[in-house]
Swiss-Prot record:
This is Histone deacetylase 9. Residues 264-284 have a biased composition (Low complexity). The modification Phosphoserine is found at residues 22, 220, 240, 450, 552. It is found in: Nucleus. It comes from Mus musculus.
Length: 588
């Protein structure tokens, strides 16, 4: 039995660094056989074994703690990564939700707008029907006129392909009339370019009476649905004075213009020749060519307004007035004429030739029988030197007006042969002829109209003011040049007293004799002015001549010379018709 019991070895799991301890013998059967050990030794062994066990437990505890810390760190890292990914997913989901909400809001707004638009569209027809019964604001006559012109131009564009290019001047007298009389009030603004602005105007063709109805009246003037009443309104509109310009002194009826041309054609053999035409050059040829290009008319009365209109057009081209840059130039139906700058260049060449003839002493052939007035005006233009474009155009306009006035004086009491521009005069026919031939007038208007002032008086006032200002500036400039010459001459004389002693004495004697002669006429004025000038010169110390110090013997002579020169200079200044009390300070 004892042989079967094997020895049991207990191996301690101690690291290699510790000291090896002898194994503990736990056999009981051997004790009995072995002798009894000392208890002190036995107690020491037990204590050593307890210490060893405690050390092993501490080591195992440390190992477990280290392993736990490693696993805890790994788990925290994984948890943080998962949290970050989760946060990212949440943010992405939130952004998607916001985008979806925005899209839904936009879609809702679009749907609401569409619903609102449909609702408004459904409500608009009854509102329009309700507004038709109510009263509206009355449109002004100018607005109606603009709308009528727009409709006429529209109908003209429709009729142009059928009628072709055979539009004559006599078929549309009203359009020629408005083109001739539509000049701007802003006459002082120069043209911006040499050519007139290219506005597209179309000549209306032959208008059908069926389609030529007036515009629909406003609600305050009830709608007219009866055809007979519409025809009556068409007739009234054709003869209504609303379509004409509101300047009563400039505007005459078409029948009166026909009568005037008839009278002028009786007095003159041909409208485009003789003293009645201001232009014997290319403009007259234009009128003849255009008159020949007109289609033959069965009645001679239809040719008269055409001639009148063409002559009026030539007068307007000859004037070449300014046009406002803010308003369009109405060149409806007018032929291709030279620009205002080209016209001014031609007039400038003509004036140069006439001034050369005047310098040579050759009398100028005047168209209106008044060569003196024309030559004086040309000399006035030549005296300017090189004026700017605005002054040149003003002087050309004044020259033409002076020629027209001379013609009126020559042909006093008769019909004026030259068709004047609307800015020149407002009287077309003499009062005797108007008294004998009175044409029926239109019925008076229903209400008053606020029209601007007549263009003739306004333009004349502007031109007169500008001309007066220009003359005043010229006069002041000449006076300034004259005074500068006198001052420079006197200063040179004072700077060189020794060389001009004899001349100063001679001038002093001559001035004294002239002063004695003129003393009876203006003694008081000159005495006052001379006293004022001498006092001021005495106070200021007017003339100080810087020279080298001279001997005491020559002091008296120099003082006498200076006094004589001062007196001569003051007498020269006073003798030039200056205002009394005019003081001149000479500083050397």
């Amino acid at each position: 039995m004892h042989s079967m019991i094997s020895s049991v070895d207990v191996k301690s799991e101690v690291p290699m660094g510790l000291e090896p301890i002898s194994p503990l013998d736990l056999r009981t059967d051997l004790r009995m056989m072995m002798p009894v050990v000392d208890p002190v030794v036995r107690e020491k062994q037990l204590q050593q074994e307890l210490l060893l066990i405690q050390q092993q437990q501490q080591i195992q505890k440390q190992l477990l703690i280290a392993e736990f810390q490693k696993q805890h760190e790994n788990l925290t890292r994984q948890h943080q990564a998962q949290l970050q990914e989760h946060i990212k997913e949440l943010l992405a989901i939130k952004q998607q939700q916001e985008l979806l909400e925005k899209e839904q809001k936009l879609e809702q707004q679009r749907q609401e707008q569409e619903v609102e638009r449909h609702r408004r569209e459904q409500q608009l027809p009854p509102l329009r029907g309700k507004d038709r019964g109510r009263e509206r604001a009355v449109a002004s006559t100018e607005v109606k006129q603009k709308l009528q012109e727009f409709l006429l131009s529209k109908s003209a564009t429709k009729d142009t392909p059928t009628n072709g290019k055979n539009h004559s001047v006599g078929r549309h007298p009203k359009l020629w009339y408005t083109a001739a009389h539509h000049t701007s009030l802003d006459q002082s603004s120069p043209p911006l370019s040499g050519t007139s602005p290219s506005y597209k105007y179309t000549l209306p063709g032959a208008q059908d009476s069926k389609d030529d109805f007036p515009l629909r009246k406003t609600a305050s003037e009830p709608n007219l649905k009866v055809r007979s009443r519409l025809k009556q309104k068409v007739a009234e509109r054709r003869s209504s004075p609303l379509l004409r310009r509101k300047d009563g002194n400039l505007v005459t009826s078409f029948k009166k213009r026909v009568f005037e041309v008839a009278e002028s054609s009786v007095s003159s053999s041909s409208p485009g020749s003789g003293p009645s035409s201001p232009n014997n050059g290319p403009a007259g040829n234009v009128t003849e060519n255009e008159a020949s290009a007109l289609p033959p008319t069965p009645h001679p009365e239809q040719l008269v307004p055409q001639q009148r209109i063409l002559i009026h057009e030539d007068s307007m081209n000859l004037l070449s007035l300014y046009t406002s840059p803010s308003l369009p130039n109405i060149t409806l139906g007018l032929p291709a004429v030279p620009s205002p700058l080209n016209a001014s260049n031609s007039l400038k060449d003509k004036q140069k030739c006439e001034t050369q003839m005047l310098r040579q002493g050759v009398p100028l052939p005047s168209q209106y029988g008044s060569s003196i007035a024309a030559s004086s005006s040309h000399v006035h233009v030549a005296m300017e030197g090189k004026p700017n474009s605005s002054h040149q155009a003003l002087l050309q306009h004044l020259l033409l007006k002076e020629q027209m006035r001379q013609q009126k004086l020559l042909v006093a009491g008769g019909v004026p042969l030259h068709p004047q521009s609307p800015l020149a005069t407002k009287e077309r026919i003499s009062p005797g002829i108007r008294g004998t031939h009175k044409l029926p007038r239109h019925r008076p208007l229903n209400r008053t109209q606020s029209a601007p002032l007549p263009q003739s008086t306004l333009a004349q006032l502007v031109i007169q003011q500008q001309h007066q200002q220009f003359l005043e500036k010229q006069k002041q400039y000449q006076q300034q040049i004259h005074m500068n010459k006198l001052l420079s001459k006197s200063i040179e004389q004072l700077k060189q007293p020794g060389s001009h002693l004899e001349e100063a004495e001679e001038e002093l004697q001559g001035d004294q004799s002239m002063e004695d002669r003129a003393a009876s006429k203006d003694n008081s004025a000159r005495s006052d002015s001379s006293a004022c000038v001498e006092d001021t010169l005495g106070q200021v110390g007017a003339v100080k001549v810087k020279e080298e110090p001279v001997d005491s013997d020559e002091d008296a002579q120099i003082q006498e010379m200076e006094c004589g020169e001062q007196a001569a200079f003051m007498q020269q200044v006073i003798g030039k018709d200056l205002a009394p009390g005019f003081v001149i300070k000479v500083i050397i």
